[in-house]
Amino acid sequence: MPRAVNGTIHKNRRRRILKDAKGFRGARSKLYRTAKSAVMKAGQWAYRDRRAKKRDFRKLWIIRINAAARENGLSYSVFMNSLKKLGIHMDRKSLAELAFNDREVFNSLVEKIKVAG
């Protein structure tokens, strides 16, 4: 009986790694061993950056809200605290969207805060 060498399984594994390495530069997309390590490292970076992306967007939203609030004479912390006290429950993403794209609505929120406080 001939020796079984897992031909199709082996070939499919190599094909999948080389497919995932498509677009990498040089040997990283051609040679299995270097492609395998490049794909593993790319996976680590992707895992890390999926988490960093959430932090980065939150930072961006806070910067945008702060800039728009300061144009109206409030700091970010005073603005957010006043919203909380007034019972206006809006997340930072939607506040940043208002500050960036719909300044009139954002300014009306600021006026509401100034009237109340």
From Swiss-Prot:
Instruction: Note the superkingdom of the native organism.
Output: Bacteria
UniProt entry tagged with the keyword Ribosomal protein: yes
Kindly list the GO CC terms recorded for this protein.
ribonucleoprotein complex; ribosome
Gene3D superfamilies named in the record: 6.10.160.10, Ribosomal protein L20
Provide the family line.
Belongs to the bacterial ribosomal protein bL20 family.
Query: What the protein does?
Result: Binds directly to 23S ribosomal RNA and is necessary for the in vitro assembly process of the 50S ribosomal subunit. It is not involved in the protein synthesizing functions of that subunit.
The protein's name is Large ribosomal subunit protein bL20
